[in-house]
Amino acid sequence: EKINAVNLEKMYEVLKFVEYGGYCRRSMDCVHGMLLIDRMKNEAVVDKAVLFGWFRKMAVCAEQYERCGEGQNYKYLNPYGIVLSDEGEVLFLDTESRENAEVMKQMQKRAVRSHFIRPVYEMDTCGSREPDLFGYGNTLRFMLAYMKVVPALTKREEIRLFRICGKCIGETRKKYSSFLQV
């Protein structure tokens, strides 16, 4: 078993999505990897191509989750709810698994909830997909603030990411209404 020097890698129960003939099905799996938050704390430097790949994969997972759940939100789109597998996959933590109870406790803390979950009074006025878009936008912002990207982002990339985050969070007049727009 491959063990990280600081022993952060372990087994997690995650959600996987299977695409078949235009349909999407959700399944559960157990993978070896680490939480995104642990990766960020342990190694704050990330390759630009890898980071952009993570951003894309998170958006794809969120879109697949919504299609499989008939528009249902994941609700835990934050660095604690994302697992990076040893194979390089970006996966959503299975929030209903007893094996992930310790991580779920971390996600229930006020500091995590207040940063990544849209306030209740705003939820009443937003569409069904906006809570996950809000979490996605704040997760991107958190990652960009916390991690050093190598090679550095160009000014154009910074502006583009700033706009994407703003549209996800709802800080601009033009908001995303679906992950297909991201």
What are these regions (language model features)?
Residues I169-Q181:
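A conserved short helix/loop substructure at the end of the activation segment
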Residues K48, F52, G127-L133, Y176:
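Short, solvent-exposed loop/helix junctions and linker helices
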Residues W54-F55, A59-E99:
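Catalytic-loop of the protein kinase fold
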Residues G21, L91-L93, L180-V182:
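Short, structured interface segments
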Residues I3-L8, Y20, L35, K57-C61, ...:
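Extracytoplasmic/periplasmic ligand-binding sensor domains
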Residues S85-K167:
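C-lobe/activation-segment region of protein kinase-like
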Residues F55-M58, G137-L144, V182:
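Short amphipathic C-terminal alpha-helix that caps PH/PH-like domains
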Residues N4-F52:
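Conserved structural core of kinase catalytic domains
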